[in-house]
Amino acid sequence: MTTDQKYQQIYRVGGMLDAGFVGQITYTISLDQVYDELDIHFSFDKRLYSESDVTPELIDKLQTLCTAKYDAPTYPVEEFRQTILHEMKTEIHTMAELNDDFIGCIHRQLTDRHMLYTKEFTSDGCLAQDTFSGVLKVTVLVFNVLLDNTQYTLTVSGHPVGQGVIAPNFNLMDTVKTGVENVEASDAISAADPALSARAVTVPTHFKRLELHNHTVESDGSLTCEELTEYLAADHVDAFAITDHNTTSGQAKIEKLLEEKHYPIELIHGMEYTTYFGHILCLNLTKYVPWNSIDQH
C-alpha cells in the first residue's frame, strides 16, 4: 500500500526489538498544521520462526519451559516443532490518541497495517475524525517478540486542510476484510434466517437470551458490525455485547443499525482488553480506558 503524493509525510521513525521484549513505546507528534486526512502506517518483520530458527536446542528449551511453567506434557518432537513454526508469533498492535482522546486501535495479526482516516473511509478499529490538529500519540503495543533484531517502521502522513481534493492510492484490501473473506459468515447468517427478520419469540419473562462476548472486523473477528447484528437478530437474542479487542469503534455503528432497523435488541457496550497478564472482558464500558488505569475509573 502506498500513499498518494499529495499526502505529506509528517513523521517517520524506525526501531529494533529483541526477543522477549514486552512493553509499550509511545511516539508523541506535534502536528504542525490542521489535517483532514491521516494515515498511520506501521510495519514489522519476523512475525514467525523460520525453519532454520527451530533448532533442537530451541525445541528443548521451549518444551522444558512449558513443562515447568504450565505443567504441560512432553510432546513428540516433530509435533512440537510444527507447533512452534505455525502457532508461535510475534504480536504487535498499534493505538492512536489525539489530544489524549482515543481514536483507534488495530488488533489484528498483520505485519503491515494502516490506520487510515479519510473523508469517506475509516479503518476498522478506528474512530472517524473531522480534522487532526494538536498532539498525536501513536503507541506501539508489544505483547511478544520471538526473534532478535525484529525491525519496525512507523510513518505518519496526512493531507493538510485546504489543499484541494485528493484521490489517495490506497489498496483498501490491506486494511479491511473483503467480501470474499466474509462469504462463509454471510452464508451462516442466511442459513440462520433467510429473511433476517427479528420475529418475537415467546420466552419466560425471567429468562433473557444474551451473547456477552462478540468480536467483529473492528478487531480480530470475521463479521462486520452489520453482519453480527443481523445474525443475532435472526437468532432472536434479547441483548448482546460488543467486546472487540482494545477498541470501542464498533459501538456507534451497531447503535445506528439497531435504530435504523428497529431491532428489539439491547446493546451492551464493552471491550476486551489485551494486557501483559492475560485478557480482561469489560462490560458497560462506553469510552476507551487504558487497561493499566482501569482502577482509576
List the predicted regions and their residue ranges.
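A metal-dependent hydrolase metal-coordination microenvironment
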Residues: 201-297
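Acidic, Ser/Thr/Pro
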Residues: 1-210
